[in-house]
């Protein structure tokens, strides 16, 4: 049987000093024989998705101690992408993922913790903690803060979210009063932004990976039902410890649960629900940390056979996360994938012996369990609040309409090909990514003239100054992991194109990335990035570019000979922006850039550079 890791600091005469310090934290004699379970919280008052997490770590801690464990809580940082967006703050967002992963590793290994409860929610926090969990490979469970309620206003016939506020603000025809009303209404409660943006996408994927409880991705932050997820997580992590340390059951370890097949399940879910393209970046990074050979070619393969079974804002205005929950949440989508013969159902999870068993219990179309049906009726109260578990509103009925509802069956899919696609071509030899769920079918094949911008800032200025015309393909380069550094999100350029009426008349290609709130023909993650010698750095104003989503291709319509000549010329100049950018790149960001790989590798550190150290 494996020993508790914590035995290193709790047992033996030589550890008297360490035990003295443990006692100063409140531990007693009997506690030194129990598993020490780390609670990695991410509470901060900077982020609406985390503002309500302050007391939830102790809620979990009390449940852990009731179940026979010792709980010790610590905090990580959390960056709000929406607040950091549109200025140099966005340079820090993706690098914060690595800092979070390192922080969890540092705390857990420094104190020899036996297991982890990860309390995450927003964009980089769940991925960072997931990377750490797979590095450490000790029992873990994820429980997130949950999505916020969609906004409501008499000025709109649909639920609102952050993107609506951004788009209306960029619309010069909208009055100041209307903009103010949207601003006040778009984000009414605590929780991660209400659409299928990056945060909610990742929290849903933890369910598919088998590392979180059913409902983790869809139960509203404000709803009383979410409290039970935290309490159950506390009990479950102690049970996982007993199985691993007491029974030598390695099937409960994260690398046993989140194996190659589980990553395929998670990616199939992402494609089926039209999730954020950022999830591709984060899944690739997590796979590397878990030593799972899952790469962009696997994602390309899956994208060709998985239909889109769910459509949520920003891909459609009608539905938000509260509607996904009402339709049965993630296990209803997984159930549809299973019945379509795609899902791997023989895999264990932290809560069930197999995914098949979990679907039978939690898919509302497969179970008659009234408690499960009641759980998925949890809905919004429409009351602005920053308090978790503060309301208990329920829908009168479930949305189990698989023909016209939020979640569809295979036979009635929104589209037979899923919501994400990987494109390859001479402009992106290692691939680039587009969220097809947000692209109008009329522009799935698009040929246009390149309009070059050397930064997101210059692109925003150009779009607002009407320099971009219908038929243009906006190229924003040197914004990759290394070139930015930090791989900024491009939500403002896409929002402004939309507000200018160019959402279906233009495309955008970048080696940066996009917010989960992005829609339109927006192609990101171009790899290799410009700063790494990628061909996106060779494009010139007026060059023709052909995008062909059905054939998964994107090509610069320039001869190989011309490209070779341009490469020789660029090698002499150096792979850097053609214009000076007024951007302060600190030592911390330079350190990140030094080791950063391109997006096709998940933008993780280049471990080859560290070998031998």
Swiss-Prot record:
Enzyme class: lyase
GO terms classed as biological process: isoleucine biosynthetic process; L-valine biosynthetic process
Pathway(s) annotated for this protein in UniProt: Amino-acid biosynthesis; L-isoleucine biosynthesis; L-isoleucine from 2-oxobutanoate: step 3/4; Amino-acid biosynthesis; L-valine biosynthesis; L-valine from pyruvate: step 3/4
Positions annotated to bind [2Fe-2S] cluster: 122, 193
Catalytic activity: (2R)-2,3-dihydroxy-3-methylbutanoate = 3-methyl-2-oxobutanoate + H2O; (2R,3R)-2,3-dihydroxy-3-methylpentanoate = (S)-3-methyl-2-oxopentanoate + H2O
A Gene Ontology term for the protein's cellular component: cytosol
Catalytic residues, chain numbering: 515
Residue numbers of N6-carboxylysine PTMs: 124
Pfam families reported in the protein's UniProt record: ILV_EDD_C, ILVD_EDD_N
Keywords assigned by UniProt, alphabetized: 2Fe-2S, Amino-acid biosynthesis, Branched-chain amino acid biosynthesis, Iron, Iron-sulfur, Lyase, Magnesium, Metal-binding
Cofactor: [2Fe-2S] cluster; Mg(2+)
Cofactor stoichiometry and binding remark: Binds 1 [2Fe-2S] cluster per subunit. This cluster acts as a Lewis acid cofactor.
Binding residue positions for Mg(2+): 81, 123-124, 489
GO MF annotations in UniProt: 2 iron, 2 sulfur cluster binding; dihydroxy-acid dehydratase activity; magnesium ion binding
PROSITE patterns: ILVD_EDD_1 (PS00886), ILVD_EDD_2 (PS00887)
Entry EC no(s): 4.2.1.9
Disulfide bridge positions per record: none
NCBIfam families for the chain: ilvD, PRK12448.1
Function: Functions in the biosynthesis of branched-chain amino acids. Catalyzes the dehydration of (2R,3R)-2,3-dihydroxy-3-methylpentanoate (2,3-dihydroxy-3-methylvalerate) into 2-oxo-3-methylpentanoate (2-oxo-3-methylvalerate) and of (2R)-2,3-dihydroxy-3-methylbutanoate (2,3-dihydroxyisovalerate) into 2-oxo-3-methylbutanoate (2-oxoisovalerate), the penultimate precursor to L-isoleucine and L-valine, respectively.
Assembly: Homodimer.
UniProt record similarity statement: Belongs to the IlvD/Edd family.
The name this protein goes by in its record: Dihydroxy-acid dehydratase
Organism: Pseudomonas putida (strain GB-1)
């Amino acid at each position: 049987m494996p020993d508790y890791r914590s035995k290193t600091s709790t047992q033996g005469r030589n550890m008297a000093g360490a035990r003295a310090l443990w006692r100063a934290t409140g531990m007693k004699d009997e506690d030194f024989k129990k598993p020490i379970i780390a609670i990695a919280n991410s509470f901060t008052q900077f982020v609406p998705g985390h503002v309500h997490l302050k007391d939830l770590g102790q809620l979990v801690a009390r449940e852990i101690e009731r179940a026979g464990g010792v709980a010790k809580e610590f905090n990580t940082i959390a960056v709000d992408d929406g607040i950091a967006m549109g200025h140099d703050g966005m340079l820090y967002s993706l690098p914060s993922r690595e800092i979070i992963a390192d922080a969890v590793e540092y705390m857990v290994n420094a104190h020899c913790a036996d297991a982890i409860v990860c309390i995450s929610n927003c964009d980089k926090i769940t991925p960072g903690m997931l990377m750490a969990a797979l590095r450490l490979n000790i029992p873990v469970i994820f429980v997130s803060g949950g999505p916020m309620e969609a906004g409501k206003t008499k000025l709109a016939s649909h639920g609102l979210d952050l993107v609506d506020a951004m788009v209306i603000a960029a619309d010069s025809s909208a009055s100041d009063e209307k903009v103010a009303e949207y601003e006040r209404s778009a984000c009414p409660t605590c929780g991660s932004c209400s659409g299928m943006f990056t945060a909610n996408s990742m929290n849903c994927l933890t369910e598919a990976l088998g590392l979180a409880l059913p409902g983790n991705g869809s139960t509203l932050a404000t709803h009383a039902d979410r409290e039970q997820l935290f309490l159950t997580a506390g009990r479950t992590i102690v049970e996982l410890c007993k199985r691993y340390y007491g029974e030598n059951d390695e099937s409960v370890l994260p690398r046993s649960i989140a194996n190659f097949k589980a990553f395929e399940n998670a990616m199939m879910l992402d494609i089926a629900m039209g999730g954020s393209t950022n999830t591709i970046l984060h899944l690739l990074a997590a796979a590397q940390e878990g030593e799972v050979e899952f790469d962009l070619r696997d994602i390309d393969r899956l994208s060709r056979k998985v239909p889109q079974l769910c459509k949520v804002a920003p891909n459609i205005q009608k539905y938000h996360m509260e509607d996904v929950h009402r339709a049965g949440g993630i296990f209803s989508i997984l159930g549809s994938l299973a019945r379509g013969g795609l899902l791997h159902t023989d895999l264990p999870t932290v809560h069930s012996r197999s995914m098949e068993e979990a679907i039978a219990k939690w898919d509302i179309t497969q179970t008659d369990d009234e408690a499960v049906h009641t759980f998925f009726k949890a809905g919004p109260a429409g009351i602005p609040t920053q308090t978790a578990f503060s309301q208990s509103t329920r829908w009168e009925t479930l949305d189990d309409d698989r023909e016209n509802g939020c979640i569809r069956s295979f036979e009635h899919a929104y589209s037979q090909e899923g919501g994400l696609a990987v494109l390859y071509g001479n402009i992106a030899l290692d691939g680039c990514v587009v969220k097809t769920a947000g692209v109008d079918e009329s522009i799935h094949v698009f040929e246009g003239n390149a309009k070059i911008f050397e930064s997101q800032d210059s692109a925003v200025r150009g779009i607002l100054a009407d320099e971009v015309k219908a038929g243009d393909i906006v190229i924003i380069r040197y914004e990759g992991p290394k070139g930015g550094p930090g791989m900024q999100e491009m939500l403002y350029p896409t929002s402004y194109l939309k507000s200018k009426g160019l959402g279906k008349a233009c495309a955008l290609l970048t080696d940066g990335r996009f917010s989960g709130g992005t829609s339109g023909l927006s192609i990101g993650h171009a790899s290799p990035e410009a700063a790494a010698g990628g061909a996106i750095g060779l494009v010139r104003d007026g060059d023709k570019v052909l995008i062909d989503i059905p054939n998964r291709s994107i090509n610069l319509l320039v001869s190989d000979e011309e490209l070779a000549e341009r490469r020789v010329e660029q090698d002499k100049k150096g792979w850097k922006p053609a214009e000076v950018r007024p951007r302060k790149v600190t030592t911390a960001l330079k350190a990140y850039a030094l080791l950063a790989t391109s997006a096709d590798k998940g933008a993780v550190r280049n471990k080859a550079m560290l070998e031998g150290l």
